[in-house]
Amino acid sequence: MLVSATEMLKKAKAGHYAVGQFNINNLEWTKSILLTAQECNSPVILGVSEGAGKYMAGYKTVVGMVNGMLEELKITVPVALHLDHGSYEGCLKCVEAGFSSIMFDGSHYPIEENVAKTKELVKICAEHNMSLEAEVGSIGGEEDGVVGMGECADPNECKMIADLGIDFLAAGIGNIHGKYPANWQGLSFETLDAIQKLTGDMPLVLHGGTGIPADMIKIAIDLGVSKTNVNTECQLSFAAATREYIEAGKDQQGKGYDPRKLLAPGAEAIKATVKEKMELFGSVNKA
């Protein structure tokens, strides 16, 4: 059964570890992540961007697939199904479809409008026993076509949004989506520390977990990050394993072209990446 992410992230904050949000793109992604979470006895958050939701035919299809897998793969660890970087309209659709958690990305609105829309969603999520993530300061890189520069959020704006009744907060601290450029300045721990001091027990979220050095992630977790998002790294490992299979000509041996065989190395590569991240975040055996 799907659960909201609130409880698992409160536990993570208190226990000084982070729960991974791993974005799903199809059946292979979802199955690989769920099986690894079960194997590692770790709570997990399945992230769905609006683009990925559309690709998988729609949010109801995603909910049906995930619920079916939870039952038939006998998954017993806590699993949240979370809309990643949702528009206001996308959030409402996910509430209706049966997601257990949503992120409202109002970072491109003026702060007053971001506050007003966040307040409405706080009320809706409370009625549906769902968790709500909000964002302050745009995260850099590209997320479904939206490009941000990796700015640092204003800690006072973070407090204003945190006080609205959301469950966890994503704040820009110099992090970006996708591959990090060679001239990246690193995470601003000063900003993170200031946000943590103003928001107290609020679990904080680190977007763009791919490419951030392990030591920086560990410091961020010590400073209050309880949820770390990973997407690009799983995509890269899946692509590399699939390329290796095809370049070795394995798709031309016997029935190697069968999609179940063709996609198997990529699925195994996702499992290995997810396990490595769960160990880094400290969530193994925390289910």
Which residue ranges define each predicted feature?
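Hydrophobic alpha-helical scaffolding
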Residues: 23, 228, 232, 260-267
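Extended, intrinsically disordered, low-complexity segments
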Residues: 246-287
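Glycine-rich nucleotide/cofactor/substrate-binding loop typically near the N-terminus or early
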Residues: 81-83, 240, 249
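Metal-dependent phosphohydrolase cores
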Residues: 21, 213, 259
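Alpha/beta enzyme core
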Residues: 3-11, 15, 27-52, 59-76, ...
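Short, N-terminal intrinsically disordered low-complexity segments that are rich in Pro/Gly
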Residues: 19-26, 52-55, 263
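Short catalytic-loop micro-motif centered on adjacent basic/acidic residues
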Residues: 19-23, 81-82, 103, 204-207, ...
